[in-house]
Design a protein with these regions (language model features):
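A short acidic, Gly/Pro-enriched loop at the edge of an enzyme's catalytic core
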Residues: 145-156
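Conserved beta-strand signature within the Rossmann-like core of class I S-adenosyl-L-methionine
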Residues: 177-184
Length: 275
C-alpha cells in the first residue's frame, strides 16, 4: 500500500505491509491496533507524554462531534476540492482527533478524486481517536518540525491551529502545491474571553508573507454557537491557549456558567509554493 510517510531514521520511503511500515533499509514501525503508527524518534520527544492527554482528547472529540465547528470543516472541505487535482497527496499537520482530516478526505472522495492522505500529531491518545474515525487515512505520531514526508511529495498541506513549521512545509510541498493555514479570527470566542478576563483583547488579523510562498487568499468564517452543557463550555475552554494562561478568578467564573452564547471566527489563509 502506498504511503506518504518516510522513515524517520534514514529518510527512506515507507511501504505499508499488513501490520507495519517498512523502509528499504529494514527499519520497521508497527501499526497500533487502532490504526496509527509511531514515527517520532526518542530524541525528538520533549516530554514523556507530549501533546493532549487522554482526558483532553476525549473532551475535544466530544465537542467537535456535536458540530459546533462544522462551518469551518465545510469550508476546508470545499477549499481542498478546489485546490487539488485528481489524485492529490494531502497532509494534515497537527491533525488532532481527525475531525477535519476525515471530513476533507471524504469530500475529496465524494468529488471523484483518489486522495492519498495522512495526518500527524504529537499526541498518542488523540491519534487513537483519529485512526478510529477514518480508516483510509494514514496517521502517525510525529513532529511538525520534522515531518515524516519526502521533499516535494505533498500537493496540499493543512495546518489548523497547529505549530507553524514553515521551513518543513516548504520542504515537503511540491512547487505549485498549496498550504492552508487556519487561525482564530478577530472576534473568536469573544464572549468567553469577556468572562475570563477583565480586559479581553481582539485577535489581530494579518496577512503575513512567507519566503517561498505566494499569498493566494484569506477567507473569514463567522458564526454563533449556543453551549447549553457546562461540559461543552469546559471542553471548548480546554481546546484554547486560554486554559494555560487564565487567572484563577476567570476560570472560576467560567466554571459557574451553565450555558453560553459565543461567537466563533476563523481566518483561513491560502498559500501556494512558488514554482
Amino acid at each position: 500500500m502506498s504511503s506518504l510517510f518516510v522513515c524517520p531514521l534514514c529518510g527512506g520511503a515507507l511501504t505499508r505491509r499488513e501490520g507495519s511500515y517498512l523502509c528499504p533499509a529494514g527499519h520497521c514501525f508497527d501499526i497500533a491496533r487502532e490504526g496509527y503508527t509511531y514515527l517520532l524518534p526518542v530524541n525528538r520527544k520533549h516530554s514523556k507524554t507530549p501533546g493532549d492527554d487522554k482526558a483532553m482528547a476525549a473532551a475535544r472529540h466530544a465537542f467537535l462531534e456535536k458540530g459546533y465547528y462544522a462551518p469551518l470543516c465545510e469550508e476546508l472541505c470545499q477549499l481542498a476540492v478546489e485546490l487539488t487535482g485528481d489524485a492529490p497527496a494531502v497532509l494534515d499537520n497537527g491533525c488532532g482527533e481527525g475531525y477535519y482530516t476525515a471530513g476533507i478526505y471524504r469530500a475529496l472522495c465524494a468529488a471523484g478524486k483518489t486522495p492519498v492522505m495522512a495526518g500527524i500529531d504529537i499526541s498518542k491518545p488523540i491519534l487513537r481517536l483519529a485512526a478510529k474515525r477514518e480508516k483510509n487515512v494514514q496517521f502517525a505520531v510525529a513532529s511538525s518540525y520534522r515531518l515524516p514526508a519526502a521533499d516535494g511529495s505533498v500537493d496540499l498541506l493543512i495546518n489548523c491551529f497547529s505549530p507553524l513549521a514553515i521551513e518543513e512545509f516548504r520542504r515537503v510541498l511540491r512547487p505549485g502545491g498549496h498550504f492552508i493555514y487556519v487561525v482564530p479570527g478577530e472576534m473568536h470566542l469573544w464572549e468567553m474571553k469577556q468572562v475570563l478576563y477583565d480586559h479581553p483583547y481582539v485577535n489581530e488579523v494579518k496577512e503575513t508573507p512567507y519566503e517561498g510562498f505566494r499569498y493566494v487568499s484569506i477567507r473569514h468564517i463567522t458564526d454563533v454557537i449556543h453551549l447549553e452543557d457546562p461540559a461543552d463550555i469546559q471542553a471548548l475552554f480546554g481546546m484554547t491557549p486560554y486554559c494555560w494562561k487564565t487567572p484563577k478568578a476567570g476560570v472560576e467564573k467560567l466554571c459557574k456558567l451553565t450555558q453560553l452564547d459565543c461567537r466563533i471566527a476563523f481566518d483561513i489563509h491560502v498559500f501556494e509554493k512558488e514554482r
